[in-house]
Amino acid sequence: MIRFSGNIAEHFSQAEYHPGSATVYMYKETITFIVCLRKFRAWLKQKMYVVSWYRTREENMKVGGIPTSNHLTGTAIDWHLYNHTITTEEFKTYCRKWAQICKEVGCLGEAGIYTWGVHLGMQNPTQAKVNGRKFYHWDSRSGKQINLPFKDLYDI
């Protein structure tokens, strides 16, 4: 267990990681995820408004998260841009960059688009095996999750 006061990484605060908690739980994978996230944020050159990052099991259940959510290990983040709806083409660009960054550090990424913003995550080994060790993406803007909707992202 690590205690933070303030930022846990450049551009990201402890309050964004786990709001309302003075205790921060991090796993080895969390640190790798933060490295990827910092690289993505530097590339994006815009503030990412964090909706959700680390969640306890109880918090995850309250928001309807799946039991295997990467938020439980701090390896997923939900975010949006201020006063901007992310387009399909922007999302695809984000996916390509996120996949590249994750590969550079030896992990496999995932991304989802929603009406409120974007989910970026790192697949755990079980998820990666199930997903054929490929970048996984989805579109939930309709209110129903559509898996792998963009053919041009199949081989990133």
PLM features: what roles do these ranges have?
Residues 1-43, 123-156:
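Extracytoplasmic cell-surface/polysaccharide-interacting catalytic and binding patches
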Residues 33-36, 46, 59, 75, ...:
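Amphipathic alpha-helical interface surfaces
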